[in-house]
Amino acid sequence: MTKPAVSYCLLSCIFALLVVSFASADKDDQDKQEYIVYMGALPARVDYMPMSHHTSILQDVTGESSIEDRLVRNYKRSFNGFAARLTKSEREILASMDEVVSVFPNKKLKLQTTTSWNFMGLKESKRTKRNTIIESDTIIGVIDSGIYPESDSFSGKGFGPPPKKWKGVCKGGKNFTWNNKLIGARYYTPKLEGFPESARDYMGHGSHTASTAAGNAVKHVSFYGLGNGTARGGVPAARIAVYKVCDPGVDGCTTDGILAAFDDAIADKVDIITISIGGDNSSPFEEDPIAIGAFHAMAKGILIVNSAGNSGPEPSTVASIAPWMFTVAASNTNRAFVTKVVLGNGKTVGRSVNSFDLNGKKYPLVYGKSASSSCGAASAGFCSPGCLDSKRVKGKIVLCDSPQNPDEAQAMGAIASIVRSHRTDVASIFSFPVSVLLEDDYNTVLSYMNSTKNPKAAVLKSETIFNQRAPVVASYFSRGPNTIIPDILKPDITAPGSEIVAAYSPDAPPSISDTRRVKYSVDTGTSMSCPHVAGVAAYLKSFHPRWSPSMIQSAIMTTAWPMNASTSPFNELAEFAYGAGHVDPITAIHPGLVYEANKSDHIAFLCGLNYTAKNLRLISGDSSSCTKEQTKSLPRNLNYPSMTAQVSAAKPFKVIFRRTVTNVGRPNATYKAKVVGSKLKVKVVPAVLSLKSLYEKKSFTVTASGAGPKAENLVSAQLIWSDGVHFVRSPIVVYATN
């Protein structure tokens, strides 16, 4: 009679152990997180097999013979590494290995024209210099949300075969067609329900940026009549290769996909990469996927143009901070879209892109605070979801204290909305009539409403106005100083980013809750300014195909239009807002002198940041090591087109910058140094440079001294080298923080 009891007890114990085992397995699985394992450059050995090596490492670390559910992605064409699902302890083991540079989480990053090119002087005219043969051999890689291949902006009509150097493919997925303009397409987004595996653009963002950089010239383009004109890229004859890393279903752009896109784009032999993507915060280079990809691209002669981000106007918000990336801020152009609100007692001017025409008819006005029976005054004033009473807003124009929730007013039956914002240089698109007002104008509307029993207003269709003051830096983009490398100025340059009309994807709505579909749309952000600079860089490369990425970047920076802190309320951070100034494509063709920094210069720069010999060898892929002199070298002495130093607040300072210029102007040239700006005492030695031949190099030092800026302040000057024909301008910035 005891045997059944023993058996029952034994079974119970086994069952309990299985439960614990499964629970433990579930916990282990839940504890796994996707990480990027960065291993530097690909070894030069002919017998090296990256995928086999990655598999072997994972098997050793995890103790599992089958790693199919662990390995996410390999990087094997342009640099070395992989993405994998790891526990915290496995991550730590990998990070300690001699062959590994860094291990960091697979994070999600964010996506960050008919008149802008004319505004910059690069006009559609026979007088505009173009080298179309070389331009047609230029390939711009676009790492973004894909592309709408049927757009006229990407038509292959009139194009010959792809350049012979092209090593890429077109893997665009189902119903995706390539041509001799759109020569390559790849996608790295995960398979999600409702979003086919394809390089097709379901966000509109990638089509917009690609056409801004290199779209064909397409006439009679507008957004419902706004911004009517010819939409074109900076280099219409150039080819486009698309690398899709963002999808609406992913809610961002994954780190592993971005690195895979760089891995392929470099090996595919693109000339320039534009990537309007970034994080909210800056990261060390070895944990920043864009900085990692950009370093290996730079080493192969490819310029990376990256958006500064849209987290401004607060200081220290720029996330694109590596010196081997060209970081772009945003400005306006001389064109603006204005949505007028006509009140019973006058007019006020708002700012948005309103394509809806209410024929000037006036409708009753109601304030969100007065249109709620379920929320407090603050939430109702913001028109927060669930607060508005449809009976109180239906058929009326609703005032909302925030631009975040006009869709809520529409959902409750409002005819239009007037919203308050502290930024009117962001012309957003809405799915019904909306006008955006600054505080003073918004208060004018409120005062009018309080002065009459039956307030009414009309929200008019947007008008296009020209000749506004421009270029002025935008409010929204991220500012310096550089929080990782304080002595490198970021952003580098400013370009048009506000209210840009460019190609769009009919597979995506132009705004949230929008049922309309368009082929061209208006968008705003450093995402839009970034491809402008990529287009300018490609334009320069068509005249100077052998120039290195740093030479092209230097030419653009040192010939930029000067900007200053007095032209806009958002310019108060001066060079930390606009960098070297506003891009000037035509002048950049002939810069006279350039500051060049190649791979070895950047390795020396990393030596000064105390990178280990092991990591330097892995990153460089060669036997690079640091000399004692390089170890002591200051980051400010990288041969960069701008000069920046962080000093102690309110204390006398003296800083020295060492630079070398290369003559790309004319032989037998003599350049004299001139310093503009009285807030710094600057000495240049030598103050005269005589260059007998092209590509001759000359070195000099710049010593800046002074009493010391207050905390959170900067002082600046401009160094200008000139031979009477060329004016090579570099900002000198000295600042103090807390």
Curated annotation (Swiss-Prot):
The protein's matches in Gene3D superfamilies, at most eight in alphabetical order, are given as: 2.60.40.2310, 3.50.30.30, Peptidase S8 propeptide/proteinase inhibitor I9 (3.30.70.80), Peptidase S8/S53 domain (3.40.50.200)
**What GO biological process terms are annotated to this protein in UniProt?**
proteolysis
Q: Which top EC class is given? A: hydrolase
- Source organism of the structure: Arabidopsis thaliana
Keywords of the record, alphabetical order, are: Autocatalytic cleavage, Glycoprotein, Hydrolase, Protease, Secreted, Serine protease, Signal, Zymogen
Domain (Peptidase S8) ranges: 116-589
Q: Name one GO cellular component term.
A: extracellular region
Question: So which residues are the signal peptide here?
Answer: 1-25
User: What range(s) does the Inhibitor I9 domain occupy?
Assistant: 35-111
Question: What EC number(s) has UniProt assigned to this enzyme?
Answer: 3.4.21.-
- Residue span, PA domain: 362-433
Protein's cellular compartments: Secreted
Active site per database record: 144, 205, 527
Name of the protein in question: Subtilisin-like protease SBT4.5
Query: Which terms in the Gene Ontology molecular function aspect does this entry carry?
Result: serine-type endopeptidase activity
InterPro entries associated with the record: PA_domain, Peptidase_S8/S53_dom, Peptidase_S8/S53_dom_sf, Peptidase_S8_Ser-AS, Peptidase_S8_subtilisin-rel, Peptidases_S8_3, S8pro/Inhibitor_I9, S8pro/Inhibitor_I9_sf
Modification after translation, per record: The C-terminal propeptide is autocleaved.
What are the residue ranges of the propeptide?
Answer: 26-112
Hey, which family's this protein in? Belongs to the peptidase S8 family.
Q: Which residues are glycosylated?
A: 175, 228, 450, 564, 598, 610, 668
